[in-house]
Design a protein with these regions (language model features):
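Short, conserved catalytic-motif segment at the N-terminal edge
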Residues: 20-77, 98-100, 199-202, 278, ...
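Structured C-terminal helix/loop/strand segments within mature extracytoplasmic catalytic/sensor domains
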Residues: 375-432
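Short, surface-exposed loop or secondary-structure junction motifs
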Residues: 117-370
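Structural recognition of the beta-strand scaffold that forms the well-ordered cores
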Residues: 43-45, 54-55, 76, 124-127, ...
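Bacterial Sec-dependent N-terminal signal peptides
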Residues: 1-21
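Short, solvent-exposed loop/turn and secondary-structure capping segments
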Residues: 55-58, 135-141, 253-255, 396, ...
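Short active-site loop at a secondary-structure junction
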Residues: 32-45, 64-127, 205-218, 295-298
Length: 432
């Protein structure tokens, strides 16, 4: 008995030391990124079999170093929204037999009906190989032809009134027809979504299918699909079906409207070409901003722990906290590769490891199993779940602060290097 107790104590001590060493190694890479101006601050949360391996923070909210990064900080998730919001509703419809993944998208999305995209299979669109445009810079179409164009020159942020907007787009003050706040001095026309965004998506060109080309256009249409299919507001439906039962309190849209203190939200870019302000508590993505901050493309905010709850549920095969959200087969269908023979590595909405690993192009470790899945975000975020090792990796940063031109997070391979540390740790402690 004494030998068993001694062995247990030694094993516990070894595990604690190993986890401490892991945290120190993660922190060193984060600090390397901060020193290289990859981001002013960041955090990593890693779980194995649902238990925390490490939760490491480094740096500050901005380079002014006024507020240190804290574990419960809330981040703009950017494109992690794609797999954390409206796609979950599509998964529900599929599970209930109400969506055929090989049916044409025009059957489910009225905006696509009668267009050059109407007959494209939904499976092809979700796998990013349908030839649809990656994105549309909707806001640029709001400027008059003789308006000053800040992308092409140094812009004086104090001269925002130099903008000349087309009718029924923006104005400087709110009114009955311009009730949607984008910024304090920028209010959007009430039907802008239908008049401009949906119209631009309908008219957008299509290239031949078969080549991988990341596109976010379908995800702009998911809020309408949810609201028309459920009779419930988009965000309200997601909260009711997923976020609230998971206990993911910070996960959601428009954080300031939900009472999250501005001091807990990490700022993103100092916008010098559209909103002319530091983006803090409002969505970074321009397209999502024009959707009133609520889109299937971008717009979600969350802490690391709350984002982890959603992906731990997916990693568990659809179950979390004694409640089943999806069948395991549904998650398997959406997180597997569908066009691997074409060299396409994507699942349905979800990102996957490259078919052939390329260290210069991958955001995940080479050790990530073919069954693993997740998504990254333009603001410097990533979440990755690996059923092969029962490992969950959450990386949150604001790499676009103060400017989206900061690229060191990619050139230094910050995320895949930290991800690789986690796999090596599992091998070293024998918990693979």
């Amino acid at each position: 008995m004494r030998k068993f107790l001694l062995f247990s104590l030694l094993l516990t001590s070894f595990t604690s030391l190993a986890q401490s060493s892991l945290a120190d190694s993660i922190r060193l890479i984060l600090e390397e990124g901060i020193a290289a101006d990859a981001f002013p601050g960041a955090q990593v949360l890693a779980l194995h079999k649902g238990e925390v391996l490490a939760h490491v923070t480094a740096g500050h909210h901005t380079y002014a170093n006024h507020r240190p990064t804290q574990k419960d900080d809330v981040y703009d998730l950017a494109s992690i929204t794609k797999t954390s919001s409206g796609l979950l509703y599509l998964m529900q419809l599929y599970e209930r037999g109400r969506v055929d993944l090989d049916a044409p998208v025009g059957q489910y999305f009225p905006v696509f009906a009668g267009t050059n995209k109407a007959d494209i299979p939904l499976r092809s669109v979700l796998s990013h190989r349908a030839g649809i445009l990656p994105w549309v810079p909707y806001w640029q179409g709001t400027l008059k032809g003789n308006g000053r164009y800040p992308w092409k020159k140094s812009w004086d942020t104090q001269r925002t009134n130099d903008y000349r907007f087309r009718g029924r787009t923006f104005q400087r003050d709110s009114s009955r027809n311009y009730p949607i706040r984008v910024m304090d001095d920028l209010w959007m026309y009430r039907n802008f979504r239908e008049r401009s965004i949906y119209r631009a998506i309908r008219k957008s060109p299509v290239k031949p299918a078969g080549n991988y080309a990341y596109s976010g256009l379908l995800f702009y249409l998911l809020p309408q699909l949810v609201e028309e299919g459920t009779g419930v507001g988009y965000h309200a439906y997601l909260r009711e079906q997923f976020y609230d039962p998971l206990g993911a309190e910070t996960l959601g849209y428009r954080p300031l409207d939900r009472g999250i203190p501005l001091s807990k939200i990490v700022p993103t870019e100092i916008d010098t070409f559209f909103r002319m302000a530091t983006l803090h508590g409002v969505v970074h993505d321009e397209g999502a901003a024009l959707m009133n901050g609520v889109s299937g493309n971008a717009g979600l905010f969350s802490s690391a722990a709350d984002l982890a709850k959603l992906y731990q549920m997916l990693l568990n095969g659809g179950e979390y906290g004694g409640r089943r959200y999806f069948k395991e087969s549904t998650i398997g269908e959406f997180t597997r590769r569908h066009y691997e023979a074409e060299g396409n590595h994507r699942g349905l909405g979800f990102d996957k490891p490259l078919v052939e690993y390329d260290p210069d192009a991958s955001s995940v470790a080479e050790a990530a199993s073919p069954t693993s899945f997740g998504h990254s975000g333009y603001t410097g975020t990533m979440v990755w779940a690996d059923p092969g090792t029962d490992l969950l990796f959450v990386f949150l940063s604001n790499r676009v602060h103060p400017s989206r031109n900061r690229r060191a997070i990619y050139t230094l391979g910050i995320r895949p290097r930290i991800h690789a540390l986690l796999y090596r740790h599992l091998v070293e402690v024998g918990n693979h």
